[in-house]
Amino acid sequence: MVDNSKIRVVVGMSGGVDSSVSALLLKQQGYDVVGVFMKNWDDTNDDGVCTATEDYEDVKKVADKIGIPYYSINFEKEYWERVFQYFLKEYKAGRTPNPDIMCNTEVKFKSFLEYALDLDADYLAMGHYAKTMVDENGVTHMMRPKDGNKDQTYFLSQLTQEQIKRVMFPLQDLTKPEVRRIAEEAGLVNAKKKDSTGICFIGERNFKHFLSEFLPAQGGDMVTPDGKVVGHHAGLMYYTIGQRQGLGLGSTKESTAPWFVVGKDLEKNQLIVEQGYDSPRLYADRLQASGMTFFTGNPEEDTEFKATAKFRYRQCDVGVTVKYHAASKTADVYFDEPARAVTPGQALVLYNGEECLGGGNIDAAFKDDKKLQLV
């Protein structure tokens, strides 16, 4: 029988209820638990409040309550260099990046995992809603958690086997209401604390104002696909493919249908818009993805297989056929049915039933072998 007291687990504690309950459960299971708070950004919000200071206070209270040591580590340099610069580069190129995935890949499960191992940890534990399973060959698989509504496998989709085999997800068989109930019964100070939203570590700021601090916006024309000017945009980086809100365009004599972003012309600094949800310019039958990573290891040879996919968070899975190219770690992904608003810069995440296979970054979308003018 395994003696859990000889197994050290470093828990990434954010000050939120999920990571706090993760630490509590591991402590109750007898592990040697160490709580660590990561500071990855200057968290002064739009009201001038340093949210990181408040969060760390909650970490200290929870750690004292459950009886574990705690530390704080600063990864602002790593976050700036590996995540934020990528974030700005993608927006500058007209794409819509997902910094949360890069944050997990480069900071939480890389720099932080290395730090945990330096503390002689056997495992790193996080409060994500995800599940791991080890097969008879000792290979770790990423699975969907019990709480499908909180499933975060999408954001973990570019981790490697080396990373996930050292990670524990204590909430994998719990729902969010169950987590809050455990926190309340244990008397944790943050049992009713609201979930954090917004960009990874940047929080709930006014996004347009925040982005303009780092990338000067250049306004330009909103045009229809045939070139008719119908409005003015505040900067291409503020808009994403399929967006309806915030365009400021009304009905026309021809149609009362709402307007949607259907493309961007970077050379002309034009935002391409069209009326109607079902614009054919929004539908793709294929995408190309790069940087493909599979949890169980990348195939060494070209391969073709059926799967389901997400290309945005909380999207229902769609059926696809994947043609993976081993030498370049790229994939051509063919949709069973045309897919709407496939957005370059976002993540492609592949599933086989309950298993998350891995994913990559969307480079381009196509319809009838013609590249869509999305960026």
From Swiss-Prot:
<feature type="region of interest" description="Interaction with tRNA">
    <location>
        <begin position="312"/>
        <end position="313"/>
    </location>
</feature>
<dbReference type="Pfam" id="PF20258">
    <property type="entry name" value="tRNA_Me_trans_C"/>
</dbReference>
<dbReference type="GO" id="GO:0002143">
    <property type="term" value="P:tRNA wobble position uridine thiolation"/>
</dbReference>
<keyword id="KW-0694">RNA-binding</keyword>
<dbReference type="InterPro" id="IPR014729">
    <property type="entry name" value="Rossmann-like_a/b/a_fold"/>
</dbReference>
<feature type="disulfide bond" description="Alternate">
    <location>
        <begin position="103"/>
        <end position="200"/>
    </location>
</feature>
<keyword id="KW-0819">tRNA processing</keyword>
<dbReference type="GO" id="GO:0000049">
    <property type="term" value="F:tRNA binding"/>
</dbReference>
<feature type="binding site">
    <location>
        <position position="38"/>
    </location>
    <ligand>
        <name>ATP</name>
    </ligand>
</feature>
<feature type="binding site">
    <location>
        <position position="127"/>
    </location>
    <ligand>
        <name>ATP</name>
    </ligand>
</feature>
<keyword id="KW-1015">Disulfide bond</keyword>
<keyword id="KW-0808">Transferase</keyword>
<dbReference type="InterPro" id="IPR023382">
    <property type="entry name" value="MnmA-like_central_sf"/>
</dbReference>
<protein>
    <recommendedName>
        <fullName>tRNA-specific 2-thiouridylase MnmA</fullName>
        <ecNumber>2.8.1.13</ecNumber>
    </recommendedName>
</protein>
<feature type="site" description="Interaction with tRNA">
    <location>
        <position position="128"/>
    </location>
</feature>
<dbReference type="InterPro" id="IPR004506">
    <property type="entry name" value="MnmA-like"/>
</dbReference>
<feature type="active site" description="Nucleophile">
    <location>
        <position position="103"/>
    </location>
</feature>
<feature type="region of interest" description="Interaction with target base in tRNA">
    <location>
        <begin position="98"/>
        <end position="100"/>
    </location>
</feature>
<feature type="active site" description="Cysteine persulfide intermediate">
    <location>
        <position position="200"/>
    </location>
</feature>
<dbReference type="GO" id="GO:0005737">
    <property type="term" value="C:cytoplasm"/>
</dbReference>
<keyword id="KW-0820">tRNA-binding</keyword>
<dbReference type="Pfam" id="PF03054">
    <property type="entry name" value="tRNA_Me_trans"/>
</dbReference>
<keyword id="KW-0067">ATP-binding</keyword>
<keyword id="KW-0963">Cytoplasm</keyword>
<dbReference type="GO" id="GO:0103016">
    <property type="term" value="F:tRNA-uridine 2-sulfurtransferase activity"/>
</dbReference>
<feature type="site" description="Interaction with tRNA">
    <location>
        <position position="346"/>
    </location>
</feature>
<dbReference type="InterPro" id="IPR046884">
    <property type="entry name" value="MnmA-like_central"/>
</dbReference>
<comment type="function">
    <text>Catalyzes the 2-thiolation of uridine at the wobble position (U34) of tRNA, leading to the formation of s(2)U34.</text>
</comment>
<comment type="similarity">
    <text>Belongs to the MnmA/TRMU family.</text>
</comment>
<dbReference type="Pfam" id="PF20259">
    <property type="entry name" value="tRNA_Me_trans_M"/>
</dbReference>
<dbReference type="GO" id="GO:0005524">
    <property type="term" value="F:ATP binding"/>
</dbReference>
<feature type="binding site">
    <location>
        <begin position="12"/>
        <end position="19"/>
    </location>
    <ligand>
        <name>ATP</name>
    </ligand>
</feature>
<dbReference type="InterPro" id="IPR046885">
    <property type="entry name" value="MnmA-like_C"/>
</dbReference>
<keyword id="KW-0547">Nucleotide-binding</keyword>
<feature type="region of interest" description="Interaction with tRNA">
    <location>
        <begin position="150"/>
        <end position="152"/>
    </location>
</feature>
